[in-house]
Regions:
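A generic structural signal for well-ordered coil/turn residues at beta-strand boundaries
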Residues: 313, 326-328, 350-352
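Conserved ATP-utilizing enzyme core subdomain
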Residues: 163, 324-325, 329
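Acidic-aromatic/histidine active-site loop/patch
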Residues: 310
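Acidic carboxylate-rich catalytic motifs and surrounding loops in phosphoryl-/glycosyl-chemistry enzymes
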Residues: 185, 319-324
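A conserved regulatory-domain signal marking ACT and ACT-like small-molecule sensing domains
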Residues: 3, 331-355
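Acidic/polar loop patches that form or flank catalytic/metal-binding clefts of enzymes
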Residues: 303, 314-321
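Nucleotide/pyrophosphate-binding catalytic subdomain
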Residues: 1-307
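Alpha-helix boundary/capping detector
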Residues: 198, 317, 336-337
């Protein structure tokens, strides 16, 4: 499959089935490499073009040794803006809500500008963002009455990840990594408890593999939206605030990833908040039970739903610092096994090894 054809697939708008059809026409799938790692990037890791390109470099380093799939949060602060729009709508301040929505759109267009893509790629991604912006504004009418219930809340909240997935896929392609944005509501099936929906894992796995495995086999990095799913009849749901870590675990489970690496803005998991305690100590190794006990004691470890799923599937979870990638981070899992090649490759590249 040529890079030109991969880029054609990444430009496709519409259903995942359309992406798969383009990949099929492009000449079939390449042999999948043995190791598979899921990267989840938090909002602070994606705040602006420079950070996106830095994170893209981490993905690029990992792809030399492994297949990689990426799950993204919204850029830091964007979900709060979107929830503010929902509250403003509930108060009946439609004009103000619409201005807020336009500001969210403008924020992402600034990041697109700062990515400095080629003219063709820039126009393509701008068009994709404008389609999303049109859908966002459709949720925020300029006049009339608006029912601002939980279902609309979830539709509004979903736009942050949908914007960031398109931008990060563009950052990856600029870095030489073929990538496509994938909207998780196309395959993450949930109940209809809006704002805190529970995923149906088995159905999600069946549907998700149909979407994601052809892209993996073709050597394309899927950039999947965290946080969101959909009911069986297609209504967008969210998995609860700060649930993108959980989304990362779900996607890793779908593709049977060897590891889930959660990239954040700290070096790993500490015994206490290092900003509040001089005695805080970085923990390099934790069992699932130890991590669960820390979380139960109130420590900020991971989203509460990550650990049960990781333990059930014996998935190794790493917590690492996007901005200090040479730091080892914290490993959560069963007794230690030889280090995963993707992790070793990143550390080597950060110390002057092959990029």
């Amino acid at each position: 499959m040529s890079l030109e054809n991969v880029q054609e697939a990444s430009a496709a708008e519409g259903s995942p089935a359309a992406l798969q059809e383009r990949l099929h026409r492009a000449g079939g799938a390449s042999k999948q490499r043995r190791n598979l790692v899921a990267f989840k990037f938090g909002g602070s890791s994606l705040l602006g073009a420079d950070r996106m390109l830095h994170a893209a470099g981490l993905v690029r380093a990992a792809t030399r040794a492994s297949n990689v799939i990426v799950v993204v949060s919204a850029m830091k602060g964007v979900t709060d803006h979107l929830l503010s729009i929902a509250r403003t709508l509930a108060d009946g301040e439609l004009a103000h809500a619409r201005r807020q929505a336009e500001l969210v759109m403008d924020l992402h267009l600034v990041v697109l500008r700062d990515l400095q893509l080629s003219e063709d790629d820039g126009l393509r991604v701008r068009r994709e963002l404008q389609f999303l912006g049109r859908d966002l504004l459709h949720e925020v009418p300029a006049h009339g009455s608006v029912a601002a219930g939980a279902e609309r809340f979830d539709r509004l909240a979903s736009f942050g990840e949908r914007f960031s997935a398109r931008l990060f896929a563009a950052a990856l392609e600029k870095s030489g990594v073929p990538a496509v944005p994938v909207t998780s509501s196309d395959f993450v099936l949930t109940c209809d408890t809006f704002r805190d929906a529970q995923p149906h894992l088995e159905q999600t796995k069946q549907r998700g593999r149909d979407v994601l495995l052809p892209l993996l086999e073709a050597g394309v990095v899927s950039v999947v939206t965290g946080f969101i799913g959909a009911t069986p009849d297609g209504r967008i749901t969210t998995l609860g605030r700060n649930s993108s870590d959980f989304s990362g675990a779900i996607i890793a489970h779908v593709v049977d990833a060897d590891e889930l690496v959660i990239w954040t803005d700290v070096d790993g998991i500490y015994t206490a908040n290092p900003n509040e305690s001089s005695e805080a100590r970085l923990l390099h190794e934790l069992s699932y039970d130890e991590a669960h006990a820390l979380a139960a004691s109130g420590a900020k470890v991971l989203h509460a739903k990550v650990l049960p799923l990781a333990a059930e599937t014996e998935m190794v979870v790493w917590v690492r610092n996007t901005f200090n990638p040479q730091a080892r981070g914290t490993r959560i899992g069963s007794p230690r096994v030889p280090e995963h090649p993707a992790t070793a490759r990143i550390e080597k590249s950060q110390h002057g090894g092959a990029a």
